[in-house]
Amino acid sequence: MPEPTFHELAQLPPPVLRQLIRRGDYTGHTSGLGQRHLQANLVILQKSWADEFLRFCALNPRACPLLDVSEPGSPHFARLGADIDVRSDLPRYRVHRRGQEPVEVSDIGTFWEADFVAFAIGCSFSFEQALLDAGIGLRHLELGRNVTMYRSSIATRPSGRLAGPTVVSMRPLKAAEAIRAIQVTSRFPMTHGAPLHLGDPALIGIRDLARPDYGDPVPLAADEIPLFWACGVTPQAVLAEVQPELYISHAPGHMLVSDRLYDEL
């Protein structure tokens, strides 16, 4: 049986897509998948870090809009889907150990610990369908690429040991489209809301748009403006500063596709 095309994957209901991912049959990015369903960034921490991180999310709701939190030791997000198992239902994960480079894997069952707490954080992939419905084209989708992401100079609000830069995702748009995109995305605070910045990237510490820190580069036309949204990769940048002994995250662009519709929250 031939592998499904990306267009065919985009038509799959979330439970079917997750089954495909769970079997290891798809390990690519999830931008453009799930259609109108919420996608979530993932952070998994040992319980000793959980309260601190929960407060960090509360202090930084633009970057870390919290969709759900698991019980200690549970790999399930009951609010997001009845059969979700965070150990296997994302296409790619990063396992971070203090003093070591992250390891990318497609299943974290062998790394799971009894005191792990999982956090689902809203993702801007969720509002991309609303932008498309408004007639706003998205370059990374047109090119079949992951979204472009950068570490910015915008500081997060600290919580105990947790402090660091805000990561932003970028989408290039023409001026009229940019105005409409701000109007559309401001309706979705649980998926990062309106952009944090538009225009000159140097004002938020980004030196070269062609060299993203995460994701894939996309070209910017002469008549386009770069728009920057807060991004759920922010926790990875912050946790890299303090280096817990062990934590797990999604690989940037490889999200959990939930059963919830993006406009339900």
Curated annotation (Swiss-Prot):
Its EC number is 4.2.1.-. It holds the Pfam family D-Glu_cyclase. Transmembrane segments: none annotated. GO terms for molecular function: lyase activity. Keywords: Lyase. It comes from the Bacteria. The keyword Lyase applies. Belongs to the D-glutamate cyclase family. This is Putative hydro-lyase PA2116. It comes from Pseudomonas aeruginosa (strain ATCC 15692 / DSM 22644 / CIP 104116 / JCM 14847 / LMG 12228 / 1C / PRS 101 / PAO1).
